[in-house]
Amino acid sequence: MEMIGGGEIGLAVVRHQNEGDIVFDKIQHMGYLTSDLDRAVAWFEKSFGAVKGGGGPLNPGYAMPSGGRNAYVQFGNVEAELLEPTDKTGLSGDILTMHHVGYVVPDINRAIDDLTARGFKFAADKPNVNVLGQTLLYFDSTTTNGVRMHITQLPGEPTPPNNGLEIERIVHAGYRVKDLEEAIKWYVDKFGGSHIGGGPSRTGARNAFVNFGQVQVELIEPTDPATMGADHIMDHVGYAVGDILSCVGECESHGLKFVADTPNTNSIGQQVLYFETDTSMGSRMHLTRLPD
């Protein structure tokens, strides 16, 4: 394997050169459930300068068993998918509930074959194409620790960056896990990942960062794992920016608040600053400045 430090994404990623290894190019988007789609779209527009890129009605299916409607919002170089189910039981219009993560692969058919050979199952027999022209296929969550993920092949023409907050990429999805060592091993074994760091947190929890392809996951074992109802629970998203202090100021001008006045530096050299969830629709997000 070849270690790549810094570079375009400012992240030490692990690129595997062995035949049969799975290539994840980037995290395309995070998906959120909401009981009020229009309100959620308006929040991204106001907070991040997002642009609505498309959406519409959704038939009942794996992503939303009751059906409903969705919208894609784009800001900087990233996007979010917002889903309003017909059955809104347990949802609040004030809260964005994390639903799934979408990973980009260069060739979805090859990725399906490679992942199937590794023991993964999928929620359908073949991919579908969404309103943005993206070809995607959800994993069967029984083979992904109970959390929803899908692989995505982007259309041939790249999407130009949008106006709004200058987000460079989604650096990672974060999950709370019952057993940190088992979770690390799963990503290493299943996705050919590399455990690059971690340790105790200020709250007494433990975390670990695992890179696979050109993406990353943060795994967090709480102080009392027995309180978790599932082995893996979606926890947060990290947005990479070039100038974190400038982005903090821009976010504050849009009414967002942060948990501290200045970023802290984590065990792998990333500068991180979380939003106050009272101002981010109850969902945990942070800005990240990647090491050079």
Predicted region positions:
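A cross-kingdom feature marking solvent-exposed beta-strand/loop segments within repeated
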Residues: 55-68, 86-100, 118-135, 159-160, ...
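N-terminal beta-strand motif that seeds the catalytic metal site of vicinal oxygen chelate
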Residues: 7-41, 96-105, 152-184, 234-239, ...
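Vicinal oxygen chelate
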Residues: 3-21, 26-35, 70-78, 91-166, 169-178, 198-199, 208-209, ...
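Conserved acetyl-CoA-binding loop of GNAT-fold acetyltransferases
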Residues: 46-52, 119-121, 189-195, 255-257
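Amphipathic N-proximal alpha-helical interface segments
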Residues: 80-87, 149-154, 219-227, 285-290
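Conserved small-residue-rich
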Residues: 166-215
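Conserved active-site tyrosine of GNAT-family acetyltransferases
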Residues: 40-45, 115, 183-188, 251
